[in-house]
């Protein structure tokens, strides 16, 4: 399985990747992108099976990225891993087709719980 991690912070991309492994999902191929615009190109080239995206990023936000994926006809399971979680954000994410919104800080157990339905 290939997982795309999208975050403008390199450190956060590494934390998310490490937490995926700590949650028991070792051996999966993890690819990265710095923002939604770059992530769209990675999706086309790498064809990930799951996308984990930050919400607030320069150039193209996470919700704009999700909207662009939908507009281009991609049907890839998508979840947000972001620093805040308001009711409005959760509603917007759900309406856009996101499967979950995991707010930072999160634990390996939190990651295992949300990814369990998507990652074997």
Where are the predicted features?
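Helix N-cap/capping motif at the beta->alpha junctions
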Residues: 32-41, 62
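C-terminal output helix
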Residues: 106-115
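Short amphipathic alpha-helix used as the core "switch/output" element in two-component signaling
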Residues: 41, 63-74
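Active-site residues of response regulator receiver
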Residues: 54, 82
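Active-site beta3 strand of CheY-like receiver
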Residues: 46-52
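Alpha4 helix (beta4-alpha4-beta5 surface) of REC/receiver domains from two-component response regulators
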Residues: 64, 85-100
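Two-component/phosphorelay signaling modules centered on CheY-like receiver
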Residues: 10-31, 96
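Receiver (REC) domain active-site loop signature in two-component systems and cognate sites
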Residues: 57
């Amino acid at each position: 399985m290939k997982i795309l991690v999208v975050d403008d912070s390199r450190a956060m991309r590494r934390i998310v990747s490490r937490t995926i492994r700590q949650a028991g999902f070792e051996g999966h191929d993890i690819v990265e992108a710095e923002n939604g615009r770059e992530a769209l190109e990675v999706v086309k080239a790498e064809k990930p099976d799951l996308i984990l995206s930050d919400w607030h990023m320069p150039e193209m936000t996470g919700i704009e990225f999700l909207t662009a994926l939908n507009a281009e006809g991609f049907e890839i399971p998508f979840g947000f891993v972001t620093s805040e979680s308001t009711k409005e954000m959760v509603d917007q994410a759900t309406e856009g087709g996101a499967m979950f919104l995991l707010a930072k800080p999160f634990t390996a157990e939190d990651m295992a719980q949300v990814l369990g339905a998507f990652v074997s």
